[in-house]
Regions:
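Active-site beta->alpha N-cap acidic-glycine motif
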Residues: 2-78, 132
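C-terminal active-site subregion of NodB/CE4 polysaccharide deacetylases
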Residues: 2-39, 153-195
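Metal-dependent polysaccharide deacetylase catalytic core of the NodB/CE4 family, i.e.
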Residues: 53, 57-145, 177
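Short loop/helix-cap segments at secondary-structure boundaries that form the rim of catalytic
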Residues: 69-74, 150, 165-170
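Short, electropositive alpha-helical surface patch
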Residues: 142-156
Length: 195
């Protein structure tokens, strides 16, 4: 495969869409934002060059006023609530998750939902019109009991990762391609490996 070429699976999928007369909607999601950084500046520049919409998942407990000021007026950028503090509350030996109850520590679903509601209100206050009703669970995971009741927090949609959608009352709009190689240096993946 030539350098810079997309994977055969991705190209085949795009061909199927074209044959069916479908048009892919492309948008980006970036997680873990709390303040303006050089990396975020590069991402903002890229979204402007390519006119690509961006859903920026902001951690409410650590979000800064400086971030809100930097993003103000950028109409292709919308803000999602990204948990509360991005702290792992999963039981020992389980995959990381903030949006989970943990009976061993006394953390209930009500506790989790309270944090999410507080974070959602804080994001709305800080980012005003750019704020969305989206909730992006840290590590793209949440307990089923939390997902079932998420609408009680003011959140109106969920964005996770992958093609699967959990059975919940709220709609999901997931990302489907991860551009970052998290296990090998946390850098961008080569185009030919995206599928």
């Amino acid at each position: 495969m030539p350098d810079g070429a997309a994977s055969p699976d991705l190209m085949a999928e795009w061909a199927r869409w074209q044959d069916a007369g479908l048009k892919a909607r492309f948008w980006l999601r970036d997680d873990d934002a709390v303040t303006a950084t050089p990396s975020l500046e590069r991402l903002i520049a890229m979204t402007q060059v390519f006119d690509a919409p961006l859903l920026l998942a902001v951690i409410p407990a650590h979000a800064t006023h400086a971030l809100a000021v930097r993003l103000r007026g950028l109409d292709r950028i919308r803000i999602a609530t990204h948990g509360w503090s991005h702290r792992n509350h999963a039981a020992a030996g389980m995959k990381q998750s903030e949006a989970t109850d943990n009976l061993a520590t006394g953390r209930s679903s009500d506790d989790v939902l309270h944090e999410i509601a507080t974070g959602h209100r804080q994001i709305g206050t800080l980012f005003a019109a750019q704020s969305t009703g989206f909730f992006v669970p840290p590590w793209n995971r949440m307990a089923p009991a939390v997902a079932e009741r998420l609408g009680e927090t003011g959140v109106s949609a969920i964005s996770g990762f992958g093609w699967r959608r959990a059975e919940t009352p709220l709609p999901w709009l997931n990302t489907h391609i991860d551009l970052i190689d998290w296990r090998n240096g946390r850098s961008g993946k080569p185009l030919q490996t995206l599928d």
